Amino acid sequence: MEFTEQMLERVAMAVNGTTELTIDGKPISFKAPFRRLTMTDAIREKTGYDITGRSEEELREACKQLNVEVDETFGKGKLIDAIFGQYCEEELIQPTFITDYPREMSPLCKRHRSNPDLTERFELFVNGKELCNAYSELNDPIDQLERFQEQLRLSEKGDDEAMFIDMDFVRALEYGMPTCSGMGIGIDRLTMFMTDQSSIQDVLFFPQMRPEKKVVNDPAEAYTAIGVPEEWVPVIQKMGYLTVESLRKLAPGKFFNDLCGFNK
């Protein structure tokens, strides 16, 4: 976080000659240090509700009391995110680090070294928008597989944003991955902030919108036509093989290993 705030302070000085900027008519200071606030404290500050140790049912009831719109597919992570998104995100005008995300919100993040219910993750918000996302990478294959299995349960509930079980990734972790971390910064959004532009189109070199890439799923009939029993089709697609062509390209031994690992 210190690196991030110092970098952005230097960027503001290099571009504008000052750390005191005006963005969308609001005065915003990029002078380090930035405010630090845990996810739990941010929600408590704006709603009075403490998410610590709450079950999915308790969080769902809290959303109802707070008039946060959710549906039955939401797990704990999305319920917390919905509360944060409605009550907190747009209020974070001055640069603010939100830290210590609950584990359910971050399926690829390492558990917090002092609280296993949280993760070592932070996001930086400026002018009510996310600018950076950073975390320590989860490198424990057992923990990662359990997280993927939880994502599978959410997918079975109807959450179309839940991850599938990536057995190649889990197997790679079993060979060993050193401790590491990373951060992603929205460079286009940062450019908007530094130049006080309200539209991303004004800061892109090539502003023409490209059509969105669509995910193609073959129907069950395409699988049964090559001899796959119909009851196995949902399982195979949850493993990430969404088309018959992707299945044809797969070595039988690898598919067998993936399937065995998936069933575990």
Where are each of the predicted segments found?
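Class II aminoacyl-tRNA synthetase catalytic cores and aaRS-like
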Residues: 1-215
